């Protein structure tokens, strides 16, 4: 299936999508594409907020975009790889059966699949600014991300795949 089709299917049933991705076999190139795609989309989601901040504070937009690009696209993937390793160790300590690939797949897919809500969060931050709407959309993104991540971990480590 196309990635966009899998993303929409994740909102209907995240465990089914993870099971299908796991059935494709381990491929690190696919994981890296998921991760980098999610990071690029996260960077794009930050653009409206950064443009608003630059306009309101009189800062240079290119400087803000450069810092966000460095942090999100180049440094954040390293942190996400470390988070995947830590979650793998925790799940294994809880009795889950699997390897590090499954943990990376689930985390990176949850991050990518939750990006539509993250893009909405960026629009709210850029057009409305701080306030209850931004908090609500940010909270929604966190809930969606954790729903996909935990459901995926359950499927990957305790499912029948």
Annotate each predicted stretch with a short phrase:
Residues 23-27, 59, 133:
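Interfacial loop-to-helix junctions that mark the boundaries of transmembrane helices
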Residues 37-50:
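Alpha-helical transmembrane segments of multi-pass membrane proteins
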Residues 2-14, 58-66, 95:
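Juxtamembrane loop-helix boundary motifs flanking transmembrane segments in multi-pass membrane proteins
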Residues 1-40:
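N-terminal juxtamembrane cytosolic/stromal segments of multi-pass membrane proteins
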Residues 48-73:
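Membrane-helix boundary elements
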Residues 6, 11-19, 48, 149-161:
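Juxtamembrane interface elements at the cytosolic ends of transmembrane helices
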């Amino acid at each position: 299936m196309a990635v966009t089709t899998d993303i929409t299917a994740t909102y209907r049933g995240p465990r089914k999508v993870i099971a299908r991705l796991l059935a494709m076999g381990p491929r690190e190139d696919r994981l890296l594409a998921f991760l980098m795609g999610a990071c690029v989309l996260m960077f794009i989601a930050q653009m409206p907020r950064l443009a608003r901040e630059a306009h309101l504070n009189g800062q240079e937009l290119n400087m803000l975009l450069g810092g966000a690009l460095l942090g999100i696209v180049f440094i954040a993937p390293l942190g996400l790889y470390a988070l995947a390793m830590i979650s793998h160790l925790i799940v294994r300590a809880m009795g889950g059966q699997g390897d590090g690939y499954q943990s990376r797949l689930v985390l990176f897919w949850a991050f990518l699949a939750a990006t539509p809500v993250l893009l909405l969060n960026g629009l709210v931050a850029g057009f409305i600014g701080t306030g209850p709407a931004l908090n609500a959309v940010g909270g929604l993104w966190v809930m969606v991300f954790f729903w996909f991540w935990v459901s995926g971990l359950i499927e990957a480590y305790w499912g029948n795949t």
